[in-house]
Curated annotation (Swiss-Prot):
This is Structural protein ORF800. Residues 98-130, 447-475, 514-567, 606-633 form a coiled coil. It comes from Acidianus two-tailed virus (ATV). Keywords: Coiled coil, Virion. The keyword Coiled coil applies. Residues 759-800 are annotated as: Disordered. It is found in: Virion. Residues 761-776 have a biased composition (Acidic residues).
Length: 800
């Protein structure tokens, strides 16, 4: 549109208007759209000014569309304005161009939406969802960048989830190392197509290296008995944890650190306890029972519940040995034989008491048995000496011989009054045994820690399954079946194996006497409980699968009945027969199978009886519905036969034939009525048909009477012909009789007409009822009196 166009021969006002229009166009071309629109709006409206305004708005909207800073939502709005203008003024702007702009912007909006969703999925590392959005984006853009993004996401989406904690700590770490190495390779391959995956690949590679180093240090802690080596390994693990805080393995490394700290702490405890036990053995070798007991007690306290039974027995036995008494010292002056006899009697008493104590100690810790035997032997020798001295005391020797004898006895006393001299070898043997027991204790603790870790893994899975079951709401039967199946699989694959592995370890520790059998029995009971739960969940999954199958068939039957409209009686009969067959063959068997399974679970106490009773009630409902449908199939079959008989009435040749056909139809209707009554259908659809057939029978019967009334009289008249013509009197009589017969026949015909009219009225009423009922669906639900409502062609539904 030219900015200097002036039409010829115009008035002054028109010229002014044209000048203003040209000015507005000029302003629009300069980009001052608001001022241009202000000028046009002040002019009188006309086709010319409206087209100029449309031109200005098109220019304005096109400039706004070119501005990428304009929000996309506003740009789409401007494009829609262009479409509206182009449709009204196609000479100003092409409608097709306007539509193309709208389509382009909608595509841009779709791309933006997909990019936002893609970025959200990538930020959450949901690569499967991101792959879906990338494929949709590629379908629109189909450029190298989107093609490469799809390829990269296909690679990373194929990376499986990390392994779940199961088995030993070392086997789990080995699995993690392999996983992160493989994942790093996959992300490295993906980064060839999309560079954003390179940092992820590097992170995964670093994680794999740290996990490998972590595994090395954990193995060092598990295999060493050196405190310094274990502490060095722990320090390395702490460094790994600090370095991995920004990595995805941070939670795992922290958990491993906690376990490693406990293991090293136990190694330190075992080492300190071992030092106390060595000190105890040394004190025992020196005959210092009190010192030996104190050190052994400190070792036992350090080991706590993990202390080997042999160390506990050793400590308890030493507690008894501390009660032994030193033998009395020899008298400094011996005045006579009585002094010696008194001394050795006191020695015997001390030996006897010590023998009792050492015997008791050896019953607790058999390694102390040689000490008790030594005291027994020494007591025996001392008793012999006391007997000898008693005899000498009764008949003392001469003074010189007496002193010589006492001198020999004192020499013997000086050699035999220190019991430790003849049990030193026994003490050394005890020390060796205790050192071995301490080494075994460290090993046993590692095994116990591993068993506890396995049990924690199993318990974590069990908690996960419990949460999954508790949070499952509003599920379909099929979803419930899958829920139980998933729960059983999870328990069988992730909870049962670590619990069984822990059981093997604890069983071995119990054989070594490191733990009591109760702990083993408890884990064995847990295994049995898990196995029972798996069996119950599998059974429940199967039961709900059967219920889902039955419910699907019932839904299918309900849909079939819902969609059954405008059917003939024969089709209604076949519909009920097919529905009954389907329920009997496809819904009832799986429901019965589910009932058997649930009944067995109820006997075991796994579920309550209410669930079983509900399924049993459902089975009864299905069986009742099958019986009812079979009755209705037969009933509508009879109804169909009855109406087929009535159809024959249009071709009857005599009233008597009509009576026969109507009676046959009534017979079928009566049989149908009995079946409807057995099916508890109220109102009975056969009742009107019976009434209709009855009226037809009565009508044809009246017609037959009319025919039989006229026929004889007409025969008389027909027979009054030459050669025996009737007299006038006879002929008058015949016609009078015929007239009377016609009058009687007319009454019969009137009655017949009345019966046929009633039959027709019933037929019309039933036709209207049937048409109304064919537009409805009657559900098989009991009313308050327990009767079921049924239209003539109404499809009966079931609900289980």
């Amino acid at each position: 549109m030219s900015s200097n166009y002036v039409p010829p021969d115009v008035s002054r006002s028109k010229a002014k208007e044209i000048a203003l229009v040209n000015k507005a166009i000029q302003l629009a071309n300069q980009g001052d759209y608001d001022e241009a629109l202000n000028i046009i709006d002040q002019l009188p409206p006309s086709d010319n000014t409206r087209q100029v305004k449309a031109y200005i708005l098109v220019k304005k909207y096109l400039d706004l569309l070119k501005d990428t800073n304009t929000p996309l939502k506003d740009r789409i709005n401007y494009a829609n304005q262009l479409v509206a203008i182009s449709q009204r003024y196609p000479n100003v702007f092409s409608p097709q161009d306007a539509e193309n702009i709208v389509e382009y912007l909608k595509e841009e909006e779709k791309v933006k939406e997909l990019l936002n969703k893609l970025n959200d999925a990538l930020s959450q590392a949901d690569y499967n969802l991101a792959l879906q959005y990338a494929k949709q984006l590629n379908d629109i853009l189909n450029n190298t960048q989107t093609n490469n993004l799809v390829k990269a996401l296909q690679i990373v989406a194929s990376v499986p989830p990390p392994p779940t904690p199961e088995g030993t700590i070392t086997s789990f770490l080995s699995q993690l190392v392999d996983y992160y190495k493989n994942a790093s390779q996959a992300y490295s391959e993906a980064s060839k197509y999309e560079p954003m995956f390179r940092p992820v690949a590097d992170t995964l590679s670093t994680s794999a290296e740290m996990l490998e180093e972590l595994l090395t240090n954990v193995n060092q802690i598990l295999t060493t008995h050196s405190v310094s080596n274990a502490e060095d390994a722990l320090k390395n693990i702490e460094n790994i944890v600090n370095e991995s805080k920004s990595l995805p393995i941070a939670p795992i490394t922290e958990d491993i650190l906690n376990i490693a700290e406990e293991m090293v702490k136990q190694i330190q405890i075992d080492n300190e306890a071992n030092q106390y036990l060595h000190s105890s053995v040394k004190a025992l070798d020196e005959g210092d029972y009190t010192k030996a007991y104190e050190d052994a007690e400190k070792a036992t306290e350090l080991l706590g519940p993990n202390a080997p039974q042999s160390v506990k027995n050793y400590t308890n036995a030493l507690a008894i040995l501390t009660k032994t008494e030193p033998l009395p010292s020899p008298p400094s002056q011996i005045k006579g034989m009585q002094d010696l006899l008194s001394y050795f009697s006191n020695v015997g008493n001390a030996l006897s008491k010590n023998y009792e104590l050492t015997s008791k100690a050896s019953s607790i810790y058999p390694a102390f048995k040689p000490i008790a035997e030594a005291y027994a032997l020494h007591l025996k020798d001392n008793n012999h000496l006391v007997d000898a001295l008693s005899k000498i005391n009764k008949k003392p020797p001469k003074n010189s011989d007496q002193f010589a004898f006492m001198s020999a006895v004192l020499k013997q006393i000086s050699q035999e009054t220190a019991p430790q001299n003849f049990v030193t070898q026994t003490y050394q043997q005890i020390g060796s045994q205790l050192s071995t027991a301490t080494s075994e204790s460290a090993n046993q603790y590692s095994l116990l820690a591993e068993a506890n870790n396995l049990i924690d893994q199993a318990n974590a899975v069990i908690t996960q399954v419990n949460n999954m079951m508790n949070n499952a709401n509003n599920l379909s039967l099929g979803e419930v079946s899958q829920l139980y199946k998933n729960a059983a699989d999870t328990l069988e694959k992730q909870a049962l194996p670590p619990m069984q592995e822990a059981y093997k370890i604890l069983q071995e520790l119990a054989k070594q006497g490191a733990i009591n059998q109760d702990s083993v029995n408890q884990v064995e009971e847990n295994i049995q409980n898990i196995q029972n739960t798996i069996t119950e969940f599998d059974m429940l999954s199967t039961a709900y699968e059967y219920l889902d199958q039955a419910n699907a068939v019932i839904t299918q039957v309900n849909n079939m009945m819902n969609n059954a409209n405008n059917l003939s009686l024969g089709e209604v009969s076949q519909l009920y027969k097919n529905a009954a067959d389907t329920l009997e063959k496809q819904a009832l068997p799986p429901m019965q199978e589910a009932y058997k399974i649930l009944q067995e679970l109820a006997k075991q106490g796994a579920i309550n009886q209410d669930s079983v009773n509900q399924v049993e009630e459902n089975i009864q409902n299905i069986q009742n519905t099958i019986t009812e449908f079979n009755l209705l199939a037969v009933a509508y079959g009879y109804m169909n036969e009855g109406y087929n008989q009535l159809q024959k009435l249009s071709n009857v040749s005599s009233p008597s034939q009509g009576v026969i056909i109507a009676r046959s139809a009534k017979h079928y209707f009566e049989q149908a009525s009995r079946e409807f009554e057995r099916a508890n259908v109220n109102p009975n659809p056969a009742k009107p048909a019976i009434e209709q057939a009855t009226d037809l029978i009565l009508g044809f019967d009246e017609l037959e009477k009319a025919q039989n009334t006229i026929a004889p009289e007409r025969k008389h008249i027909a027979g009054a012909r030459p050669p025996n013509p009737p007299t006038n009197a006879e002929l008058a009589k015949y016609y009078e009789q015929l007239s009377n017969a016609y009058n009687t026949a007319a009454e019969y015909a009137y009655n017949a007409e009345k019966y046929f009219a009633e039959a027709e009225s019933i037929a019309e009423s039933e036709s209207e009822t049937t048409e109304s009922e064919n537009n409805e669906t009657t559900e098989s639900t009991a009313n308050s009196e327990g009767e079921k409502q049924e239209g003539e062609h109404g499809a009966r539904l079931i609900r289980v």
